[in-house]
A protein has these predicted regions:
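Bacterial N-terminal signal peptides that target proteins for export
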Residues: 1-7
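Primary mode marks residue(s) on the alpha4-beta5-alpha5 output face of response regulator receiver
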Residues: 23-189
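Hydrophobic h-region of N-terminal signal peptides that target proteins for export
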Residues: 11-19
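Sequence termini and other peripheral, non-core segments
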Residues: 8-9, 21-24
Length: 189
């Protein structure tokens, strides 16, 4: 999951459309480049085709508003790559992740009531694996580049304590371990 410069695109990507508008007012994200067909293709690359084909596809306009490019039916919302970040980062997320992102935007602990799934099958880059609010890497640090992955949130982040927090551990790892924003990153390969 990417929390970085241009993070608002990713954050808003997983919000249910009603919450996206509220979050979009908080901080405008850069608009994705390309025509509508290219943006839809980019957004759909975030998730398995059976999810992406029925997902809402949306983007953030240059003025920070959510624009639906295609209505969906399965409760997932996909957003295209943010061209202003160091790695491809389209995202496709369910409504539980929307709750997580709403809480993150408000800097409040998320009140997750069910398991949530988000896909980033093109990968992502993150400012930090430990600080949920870092917008750029700390001095002397690099972006944490994560290959294709699925993200999982659970109602109680302590349920993830058995997993390592090292993104180079070779398997699932916890991002933001020890915080209310902890979630499991599951590499696709």
């Amino acid at each position: 999951m990417s929390l970085k410069m241009g993070v608002v695109l990713l954050v808003i990507a997983a919000l249910p459309l009603g919450a996206q508008e509220q979050a979009g007012k908080a901080k405008a994200a850069p608009a994705a480049k390309g025509n509508a067909a290219a943006k839809i293709a980019s957004a759909m690359s975030a998730a398995p085709s059976r999810i992406a084909s029925a997902a809402t596809i949306a983007e953030i306009s240059a003025d920070g508003k959510i624009v639906t490019l295609r209505a969906g039916t399965n409760g997932f919302t996909c957003f295209p790559d943010d061209p202003h970040t160091p790695a491809p980062d389209p995202i496709c997320a369910d409504k539980a992740w929307g709750q997580w992102f709403e809480a993150w935007m408000a800097k409040k602990p998320p009140m997750i009531k069910q398991v949530g799934i988000a896909y980033m099958l093109m990968g992502s880059s993150d400012a930090s694996n430990t600080d949920p609010f870092a917008m750029k890497p700390a001095a002397g640090q690099s972006w944490v580049v994560t290959p294709a992955h699925t993200m999982v949130i659970v109602p109680d982040p302590k349920q993830l304590d058995a997993y390592p927090s090292d993104p180079k551990s070779g398997g699932p790892f916890v991002m933001f371990k020890g915080t209310p924003y902890a979630h499991l990153m599951v590499p696709a390969h």
